[in-house]
Amino acid sequence: NQNGYVFGAIYNKKMEVVHYGTNKKEEIQLFRGSKYVQSKIGHTYQEAKKLLQTGCLVCFSGTPCQIAGLKNYLKKDYANLITVDLVCRGNPSPLLFRKYLEYQQIKYKNKVTGVKFRDKYYGYNYSTMTLDFEDERIQYHYGMEADLMLKFFFKGLCSKPACHQCVFKSIERVSDFTIFDCWNAKFYNKIMDKAGATHVFIHSQKGFDYFEYLKSYFVYQKSNVQKVVEQDGCMMLQSAIPSTRRADFFRDLNNLPFDRLQAKYFPLTLMRKIIIKMKPFFYHIGIFSIYMKLKKML
């Protein structure tokens, strides 16, 4: 409503993750959703600076290192700049993501038109990788036990080396806001539904002022910082832990077809095949939530 610009990570037409700026409300949705890939900053720092110098309001979102990079590039504080970082596990390789998409398109004989790394198809407590294809009849909703991109990421095989000794792992940040998942929303507010909730840390007076201005648009509850970090914020303080096989994995990534990578690093055992089939079945017969509760108990 103030003719401002928002910058953040989106998928371009080539399904690459890139930073992009817009002042169009209908494009804001492009920034939604987790993207477990290192985004290309491109010329967005320069574009943001030009807008700031004209007095335009700018909101720039990204990983902590990207926000620090922006601040370093600008060399000064701007009253009309709002920065938002997120708690990230690490920045996976764009090369891996490109090869993953190529593999899926060959496997399904169809073009991928959309990617959701953390889709809520089965609800907030079990997010999946969802792929959209040109042929809308193709359904792809798989969690870490079946999806290779998620598997490689969460097993520490594909994040860049700097993520393993991240200098931005701290509660205090250079940004105005830090956002991350609130996995234990039910302990804070009973009305939270299966769509989930987000923690918001405010680091500056500017951030506080904007939060006060916007808070009537959403449901919120104040929380204790240390309690939140203990329950949901371990990645705020801990760097990604690399797999001992990471170096081998990247050598193989450049030389082996994607299906050979799966066979070498995560062979499809009979038990994995059973688990992959069980979850969609439980969901369709209406007992998936019961299955997830039993899994947590075990």
Task: Please give the residue ranges for each predicted region.
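Low-complexity, highly charged intrinsically disordered N-terminal segments
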Residues: 1-14, 21
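Long, compositionally biased charged/polar accessory segments in the mid-to-C-terminal portions
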Residues: 1-5, 110-298
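Generic beta-sheet signal
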Residues: 4-6, 56-62, 81
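Short His-Asn-centered micro-motif
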Residues: 9, 60-64, 84-87, 180
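Gly/Ser/Thr-rich loops at beta-strand to alpha-helix junctions
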Residues: 13, 60-70, 90-92
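Glycine-rich phosphate-binding "P-loop"
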Residues: 17-46
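Cofactor-cradling patches in redox/metallo enzymes
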Residues: 43-53, 60, 68-74
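Short, flexible loop segments at boundaries between secondary-structure elements
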Residues: 82-105
